[in-house]
Every structure is written in structure tokens, then in C-alpha cells.
């Protein structure tokens, strides 16, 4: 059961990774990018359309990750500690902290993207989106590294 939840968690994380990366690239792209350039393609789809999906995917990924976390703490972490993977454990501790910080900024992120653009929210949108993108990328990469060190079913 845990392996199935981990796989679904990973699939949702990939969808979240794609959505937040696209939105971050779109908002950080130059506003006058040529239509057929690399950044122009990011700007072609309005970044506002991603906000609700990102909030939903973040919460779904967090809930599934919380379920898998119990298995990790009981069955996987003791092996990592025994084998002295202290760097990996430290990165995972940072991941835990970053994910909770992401949960804390999620309402502000959603509120900034819900309001119409009035020029005042532009900088706040960019900062919150880039911060959330960093958290999602960090969590994704650390989760994969830990799974590679001592994966499920080992």
C-alpha cells in the first residue's frame, strides 16, 4: 500500500514540478520576449491559470507525503542513521522545514494570483512563485536522492 501511495505522490510531484516551473519561468521571463523565442512560449499561456492547480497539487502532494513520511520514519530512517548518511538526513530535515514554510506561504501565493494585476502584486507574485518553485524543486530532488539511497522494498 505504501509503495502505491509513494508512486502516486511522485506522479503528483512531477505535475506540480511542471506547473510551478512553467509559472516561475513565465513570470520571470522578459515582458517583451519575442513570440517564438524560448521565453515567449512561456508567456503565451497566462501564468494565472496555474495558481489553483498548483495549490491543489501542493496540498495533495503534502498529504500523500505525510502518509509516506510515517513509513519513512519507522522503516527507512533507522537504516540511514545506521549507515551514517548524515548529509542525506540533514537535507531531508531541510526538506521538512521547507515544505512547512511552503504551506505557510501558500495562502499568500493563492491570494496574490487571485487578485487582478494592478502593478502592485507583480513583485510579490514573482517572489512567492520563485520561492515556492525552489521549495518544490528541493523537495523533489531530496526525495529522489533519499529513495535512491534506501528505497522502498529494499
Annotate each language-model stretch with its function:
Residues 1-154:
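Polytopic transmembrane helical bundles with strong interfacial aromatic enrichment
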Amino acid at each position: 500500500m505504501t509503495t502505491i501511495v509513494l508512486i502516486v505522490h511522485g506522479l503528483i510531484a512531477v505535475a506540480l514540478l511542471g506547473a510551478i516551473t512553467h509559472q516561475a519561468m513565465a513570470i520571470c521571463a522578459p515582458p517583451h520576449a519575442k513570440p517564438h523565442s524560448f521565453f515567449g512560449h512561456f508567456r503565451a499561456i497566462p501564468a494565472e491559470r496555474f495558481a489553483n492547480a498548483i495549490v491543489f497539487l501542493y496540498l495533495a502532494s503534502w498529504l500523500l507525503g505525510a502518509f509516506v513520511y510515517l513509513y519513512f520514519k519507522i522503516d527507512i530512517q533507522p537504516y540511514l542513521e545506521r549507515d551514517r548518511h548524515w548529509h542525506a538526513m540533514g537535507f531531508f530535515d531541510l526538506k521538512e522545514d521547507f515544505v512547512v514554510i511552503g504551506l505557510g506561504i501558500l495562502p499568500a501565493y493563492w491570494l496574490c494570483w487571485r487578485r487582478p494585476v494592478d502593478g502592485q502584486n507583480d513583485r510579490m507574485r514573482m517572489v512567492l512563485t520563485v520561492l515556492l518553485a525552489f521549495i518544490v524543486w528541493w523537495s523533489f530532488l531530496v526525495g529522489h536522492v533519499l529513495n535512491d539511497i534506501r528505497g522502498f522494498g529494499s
